[in-house]
Amino acid sequence: MVYSYSEKKRIRKDFGKRPQVLEIPYLLSIQLDSFKKFIDLDVDGQHGLEAAFRSVFPIKSYSGNAELQYVSYRLGEPVFDVKECQIRGVTFSAPLRVKLRLVLFDREAAPGTVKDIKEQEVYMGEIPLMTENGTFVINGTERVIVSQLHRSPGVFFDHDKGKTHSSGKVLYNARVIPYRGSWLDFEFDPKDNLYVRIDRRRKLPATIMLRALEIPTEEILGMFFEKNQVRIDGNRFMSDIVPDRLRGETAQFDILDSDGNVLVEAGRRISARHTRALEKAGIVELEVPAEYLVGRVFACDYVDQETGELVVAANDLLTLENVLALKEAGYTTFETLYINELDHGAYISDTLRIDSSTNRLEALVEIYRMMRPGEPPTKDAAETLFTNLFFSEDRYDLSSVGRMKFNRRLGRETSIGAGTLDKDDIVDVMKQLITIRDGKDDVDDIDHLGNRRIRSVGEMAENQFRVGLVRVERAVKERLSLGDLDAVMPQDLINAKPISAAVKEFFGSSQLSQFMDQNNPLSEVTDKRRISALGPGGLTRERAGFEVRDVHPTHYGRVCPIETPEGPNIGLINSLASFARTNDFGFLETPYRKIVDGVVTDEIDYLSAIEEGQFSIAQANVVLDETGRLADDLIPCRHRGETTLKESSEITYMDVSPQQIVSIAASIIPFLEHDDANRALMGANMQRQAVPTLIADKPLVGTGMEKTVAVDSGVTVVAKRGGRVDYVDASRIVIKVNEEETVAGEAGIDIYNLTKYTRSNQNTCINQRPTCNVGEPIVAGDVLADGPSTDLGELALGQNMRIAFMPWNGYNFEDSILISERVAMEDRFTTIHIQELSCVARDTKLGPEEISSDIPNVGESALGKLDESGVVYIGAEVKGGDILVGKVTPKGETQLTPEEKLLRAIFGEKASDVKDTSLRVPNSVRGTVIDVQVFTRDGVEKDKRALEIEGMQLRQVKKDLSDEFNILADGIFARAKNLLIKSGIEESRLESAQREKWFDLTLTDEDAQTELDQIAEQFVEIKADFDKKFEIKRRKITQGDDLQPGVLKIVKVYLAVKRQIQPGDKMAGRHGNKGVISTIKPVEDMPYDVNGTPVDIVLNPLGVPSRMNIGQILETHLGMAAHGIGVKIDRMLKEHEEMAKLRSFLKEVYGAGTTHQEVDLDNFSDDEITRLADNLRKGVPMATPVFDGATEAEIKHMLTLADLPESGQIALFDGRTGREFERPVTVGYMYMLKLNHLVDDKMHARSTGSYSLVTQQPLGGKAQFGGQRFGEMEVWALEAYGAAYTLQEMLTVKSDDVNGRTKMYKNIVDGDHRMEPGMPESFNVLLKEIRSLGINIELEEQ
């Protein structure tokens, strides 16, 4: 493999056995592609805004005299960029402008004659835009729209599993689900009649639907039944015989062949053997007794030819009288329906009998009554309602997906068709349902991923936009119908409010629009790749059963079987598998390598769950020979959801990668294959809660996915083009782009600005640090700067800690964790949290609130950290209770006592008519002020601090832009200088002249002169561009802010809080091994090894066997080897070993084990080898990909390389006594995470606080400043101790005895420490509840 200069800095040793066939697709593509589809112009009008407009326009007036047509749309430029939107608390969006055409028709002239056409561009609200990382900024906060997994439109056949009827009979049903419109259900009842329901309302006989479609009874029977013909021959009845149709019936008479031999005896059931004998004998007609025919059903109407009278109607039951009447009417043959209890039920025939309607109108009226009970039906209303239900494009749409699924399920050739239903569709669904009822087909599996599809951002936004447009459509129609339209323009017809409201509501408060989890890069990526079955049009937690939540065979490679939340949402919220993507229809697809005649090709096909069923698919770890042929004769493979063994010639596909079945979070757990699934689930979920530490530390044992996550998450800065690093500081990186990658006529400079100390959604700190140095060569895709939780472009969620598995005085009982003081002292798990506190000054009824440092009744010391505007200084260290922003609010006039009047007369007015409502630091917080933002309403005078901040921002912007300009100008002048020197001008003369004067020189060579003119033009352009950019920025900074009504000023203060690790904090490994820190012990008390190296963390060995997460042990061993090799390299560097020796040792390390990785260290220069070795001093990072990782032998080999015992266990000594422990202990390096469950956020004590209204007991929880619950069991404990008085005060004055606690407070004030308990309020609540049951209880005084 060829490594770039940056990649050579640190190379991860990979234990993967299989080469990567397919790169992992861009992780955020599900979000970005979907939204791009929504926003981009779609010529076909199938997707996005274009589709929404085309589905609603043109809007015609009721009279048909006017029509509003859609022409095109365009999105404007957003006013603020993403960062500005976050600071100002506004939505990152672009204005939508739509070109509409109003066409007026001439009433007097011929229909369709155009009188007037007006075209105009109309503003239709703002459309939120997606940032380049797949998020939306709504009201200043980053949000993610989670994709939804919903039931695909189409037709589904199911049964009730025998739960509906007491007999336990299985009742089958069919459901036609459109993308939008009414649901259509067909279902059987216990008597085998077929019913129809529309939108889950009252059921009607299904044949009403057929009658409403104008199908006569005879035709209905013809569609659903085969016919038997009977010939009347004198007094004999000759029935046509199809031997197959007799199977299962009981012979009521002997059936003889032409020779008189008995083929079937009377009373015998006719079996397949009998039917074969009948076929062989060639019997096509049999004489049958009249009784045999009685009870059969007539297939058609029979009319007396002479009188025209109906003799027998279709679907009548055959009686002897009927047959005689037919005979008298001159009929010699008649047809009956072929009905057979076994596999040709009489369902439709029976249903027709209970159907009260006889013609189309009656059927329509019946449907109207069911849909609109209580309204009088008219013919037109009934027809309109029925047509609108399933046959109108405005009201009903199956969508292309629905039509494809519908046709495919009914076995049709084509997968395209109309979005509405037609007669054939409804009949075919009923036929298919009857086929299933007859046992000739199976019901559908609704949890199959072929029946569930993904709705992503773009599609959901389009639907919401359409909802807004439909609201507008109604208003436009009414407006078009009102009188004179000659003076009306399209602008006057459209009100953009409903559209904006629909879109805003979706992005702001829809169930699927979630506050982005921004704990660390992994949690961001996972949030964007999440798939939820909840949300509008989806399931609800309460109704979802086990089947929906369970892992389904079709999840393989599409949805991760591991990563899902614990708790009520388990299985309803899933994560996309690593290689999965959605196809055009929204179904999940996963890639497979094609196999032809047992040979694996490089061709890769993406298959959806629907297509996958018919193939036999081998796993990724199948053995191949050198030619790429399947080596074994029998191969384990998946076929139709089952795992079977098949011959190699039958195998059609194989997996792309062993990690294709798991999600991103699960694929960064090393040795995942050795962990129990439940613990792996916890491990995957807990990685998302890891807080970024002060100094990120790459995992020594990883899986090789760390780089992908770090780069795709967007937290790092990645080079867009190759070049050389020209300039680096903490906030900016400048790259001089390679000549071959620049476009003709551009400056060839790329500038990357870094994010510094910004607050994330979870209050963690986002900060980027450059990883490159000036002069280094860069390739496109190289990581230039690390973000939070990344180290040299690799994900680094935690720290590598030296751990020992051993008990230590009970301090690691029940998953507790014992850590060394060194961990805290070295700030290994110190994290920075940034809190935003805001103070709002409003205009009140009594006058405006003021932000000032003149606050009543506050001493000088409390105002020491405020400036004269009343806002805290940046850099001030504050603690709980300190004032951050001084604010006073006017208070109402109160009646003053004479003393107060006197004081006011002497000391002036001010102090008494305002109250102090300053913003103070919350009690449990202490930190440093790192930033202050002041927002002032337009028209309100800015205070001194606001002007200072404004001036500072302007200076910063000017500096940034002029730096940018200078860098670009330098590039331009460098090109001009080269050109002039080539043209023969001396360098010294150029140096002495002003640079801008160079462009005035005239050259003899025409081509050179043209090029110089071009360069001069470019210079003028970038100068003008600089002025323009600065003016735009200046206007943005100096203009007033658009604040909510009644708000005059907002001050936002940002506090940085540094949190060291402490007892009570939660920590975890990557294998679901979580625990809480019990205590921090001095370094000298910790167990140490022979060399005197103490361990950092002591874990309980009993946490491993029952949890079955052995991955942590293997990680510990491999981590020990990785660190040991690092120590060896460090020693070599310190002892200045020969380069050849160092190189050969590194070769041995990277070449160990059977691996596909090829690191050609011979191509590395000595400097590169030294730099690589320098970065490996703390340990050689290793990758053990999931399901393809390091074997036990390889781990042992690495331990040997590090000169460590193969067992991975070493002798430890007790730090307190110096004695050796009884037996060797497993010691190694494990990657530990600090989770966002910090004791500082949970610690809480109540003094006095609020009480619940009903029970009068203290509220619960930190947010409510609540008390500690003293529950039932705690009461038992005090009872057991006999602590009667303690118990009494717990149940009365400390809880809900209102009078008692008031008296006690009074007593304490008086210095009298007694309590008089009264009646607890909860007793009164109990009395009231008993009274509500109708039992009166009263307390009588003795």
Swiss-Prot record:
**UniProt cross-references to PROSITE patterns, sorted A to Z:** RNA_POL_BETA
Catalysed reaction, written as an equation: RNA(n) + a ribonucleoside 5'-triphosphate = RNA(n+1) + diphosphate
Enzyme category, top tier: transferase
GO CC list: DNA-directed RNA polymerase complex
One Gene Ontology biological process: DNA-templated transcription
Q: Which domain of life is it from?
A: Bacteria
- InterPro entries recorded for this chain? DNA-dir_RNA_pol_bsu_ext_1_sf (IPR042107), DNA-dir_RNA_pol_bsu_external_1 (IPR019462), DNA-dir_RNA_pol_su2 (IPR015712), DNA-dir_RNAP_su2_dom (IPR007120), DNA-dir_RNAP_su2_hyb_sf (IPR037033), RNA_pol_bsu_bac (IPR010243), RNA_pol_bsu_CS (IPR007121), RNA_pol_bsu_protrusion (IPR007644)
The EC designation for this entry is 2.7.7.6
Sorted alphabetically, which keywords does the UniProt record give?
Answer: DNA-directed RNA polymerase, Nucleotidyltransferase, Transcription, Transferase
MF terms in GO: DNA binding; DNA-directed RNA polymerase activity; ribonucleoside binding
Question: Pfam families, from UniProt?
Answer: RNA_pol_Rpb2_1 (PF04563), RNA_pol_Rpb2_2 (PF04561), RNA_pol_Rpb2_3 (PF04565), RNA_pol_Rpb2_45 (PF10385), RNA_pol_Rpb2_6 (PF00562), RNA_pol_Rpb2_7 (PF04560)
Q: Which family does it belong to?
A: Belongs to the RNA polymerase beta chain family.
Q: How does it assemble?
A: The RNAP catalytic core consists of 2 alpha, 1 beta, 1 beta' and 1 omega subunit. When a sigma factor is associated with the core the holoenzyme is formed, which can initiate transcription.
This chain's function reads: DNA-dependent RNA polymerase catalyzes the transcription of DNA into RNA using the four ribonucleoside triphosphates as substrates.
Protein name per the record: DNA-directed RNA polymerase subunit beta
Q: Which organism is it from?
A: Pseudoalteromonas atlantica (strain T6c / ATCC BAA-1087)
Q: What are the leading ranks of the lineage?
A: Bacteria, Pseudomonadati, Pseudomonadota, Gammaproteobacteria, Alteromonadales
